[in-house]
Amino acid sequence: GKYSKGQTKRITGTFQANIRGFGFVMVEGEDEDIFIPGENVNGAFQGDEVECIITGAPGGKRKEGKIVRIVSHQVKKIVGLYEKSKSFGFVRPDNQRYLKDIYIPAGKEMGAMDGHKVVVELTSYGQEHAKPEGKIVEIIGHVNDPGADILSIVKDYDLPTEFPEKVLNQAVRVGKDVSEADCAGRLDLRDWQMVTIDGEDAKDLDDAVSLTMKDENYQLGVHIADVTNYVQEKSALDREALKRGTSVYLADRVIPM
């Protein structure tokens, strides 16, 4: 955490909201967070970098504090349910840590209708007693549409669903030929019969098994691909891999690593 000089020490951290209205400031390098009562949140938004002061530690328990300044907002877009009124609308966030509905002025609804799941871009974070304001930038679908709930999760966590063209082009070119340099220091098992145990729609075929006879005993081989041999550091493939450390398995789809 960062501490400012002066009579009252200010502590910088990340605000984590609770659906009941209070929250906590998480300070880097500190084991204990700071409890922020609802009346001391002062308009802070989930994920904001904030400055707070310690107001006490009643009964020797967890430190309590008050947010005195919002340093920066981290959340730019929110997924939620659009509710239309007469000449304006609101988006009710899926994530209940966003404690206020988002006001959508007339003309900023992008054609969304009542009951649509949408992505809203925040244009104002509001004040202590004022709602945040935003504009709809994407309509996911109606709340009752099949798959709308899963796609809302994808959008909420900003999961990458498409590979950039440059990455796809690089992927096509690598690994087609095995050079002598690739073989150096490795045991060549290309004449062994190996199988992968993956579904038909799997993309990351990076492991396989084999079964051979050795002195009247079965030898089970487990083979793991050395993917880094084919991915050059700081290439488009390498940068994309940094964003996709693991595959994401959802109810009706897989977003591959």
Label for each model-derived stretch:
Residues 1-221, 228-257:
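Charge-lined substrate channels and their catalytic hotspots, especially those that engage the 3′ end
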